[in-house]
């Protein structure tokens, strides 16, 4: 039966937002076509009919970029889209995080949300359209989603907040905030900012929430008209009798195991307790389902005890106070041949960051759905399995590693010197060597140290800290510097990075349905206190960037030429510039305004390359005398090289004061002679005279 097409419209930040339902992808549980300006995104939500036998909620969110959306054909031999770009992976995570908490506890049906970007208007964010579409597709479907949610981008231009700023406005904005939530509360924040005070960030979040409420009302109105009845699902539940039996048996032992201060010893104590209880039920010949439930009940008891300790006794598993940071240590200059290195350790979390400086030609070229651009600052994050004492495959970066690397990049970018101040490409790599929570924030601290060790003149040091939350009813406890167990068993992971002056990055994920303004405000202020403490420690390790770069870092020499001369330096098909590079071993980057960056480890070679370029662009002046070298002899005269790339002709009649029969009677190839420029004709040919120089010398002697 043909389904009726429904169209709904609203204004969103001064641009039309139109939703079409019932025409496309009708076999999905829910499907919507979102048109935002000229951006078009198809969002679908699909669920399995039966629950999966797993101990987690199997949700997958995909943000699919199609290059036809911006009128491009993919590069390479295959000519089709390959692996998702970093931007697509980050967008998938951005959509996943606010919708994941809004499914019932025990829901185990597989859910897949796919957003296909089909057309892109650069001023109408496809990510925000996809987030809206994903929520609406779930809301109108028969999947038991407890939304809707919505998300907006907030910028601040000239002190005023702007919803979904255009590309031009974003260039002027001192923050880039993505906030998502339900109509009652915020449940996801992702932000980069130029050292913005905590109070301003909070106001921006709440400003965004007002727009979110309007978008949710729009979704609820659509769902009331075209939404399907929600499917009946069986929620996974623990056996109450078995739970009571195990609770009575091991409650005291769980309390003791949870309070073992050291991570590995605590994990070993919990594992031993689990093994003993499972063994006891195996002896009773319990079936597989019962043994699975035994393990899940023990996990639940551990979670309850950790949360009880924090909320009731204000005691954490490792014995710290709720606002106490783990012991800190740091060092710089660990790797002699690298350009800069920094080690940062916080409790059992440790990150080693390495800074590498390159020429401007080493920038990363970004060619996706956005405007083509380059990136001269990169921050990469690696999380090897040995960091948690496990074995595992060493593959390329996963979604989590890409997300953590991007968060560090966002946190550090506001303090990176401009290209004019520091004409280098900067790459940071953070290797997580030990992990017990907050590794992304440790990598930010280690990367700050590595840049200072490398001599990068950053505007201010940046530190990061992760805040946690345990909420029970109306009572809540905010934790400073959460460790792995608190992250895993708590309700919030709120990462805050910044300088002494203000915030440079925020990232908030929660497992509950939302957070109030009061909790956000308290978490931001508690994070500031912790951040300042960490910055103070880092400044004791290295108080300012080193004045000298590493001897192994490239030296960069900058020069300015007339932009009209750029083609002379490059030469036909790059022949001239390649000759200079071959002769000197340097890298040469030329800007459109005539700025040239020459880089190599050898300063003498930089100077040599500069001299060659100066000679190429040097202008020959009429009336000037030059010491040139005879390069070629013809019957009618001699061709003399004045300097690299500039020749002129001394006609036979201009070689001497007396009559010359043969050119070879006066000069030979290789001779150095003084010549005067007498004329530059319309074709740019240079005429020289040796006779004029001889005459001038005679007159001077008289």
Curated annotation (Swiss-Prot):
Positions in coiled-coil regions: none
Protein name: Polyribonucleotide nucleotidyltransferase
Reaction catalysis annotation: RNA(n+1) + phosphate = RNA(n) + a ribonucleoside 5'-diphosphate
Obligatory cofactor(s): Mg(2+)
Cellular compartments annotated: Cytoplasm
Positions of the KH domain: 554-613
Matching InterPro entries: ExoRNase_PH_dom1, ExoRNase_PH_dom2, ExoRNase_PH_dom2_sf, KH_dom, KH_dom_type_1, KH_dom_type_1_sf, NA-bd_OB-fold, PNPase
Keywords, in A-Z order: Cytoplasm, Magnesium, Metal-binding, Nucleotidyltransferase, RNA-binding, Transferase
Single GO cellular component term: cytosol
Family: Belongs to the polyribonucleotide nucleotidyltransferase family.
Catalytic EC class: transferase
GO biological process: mRNA catabolic process; RNA processing
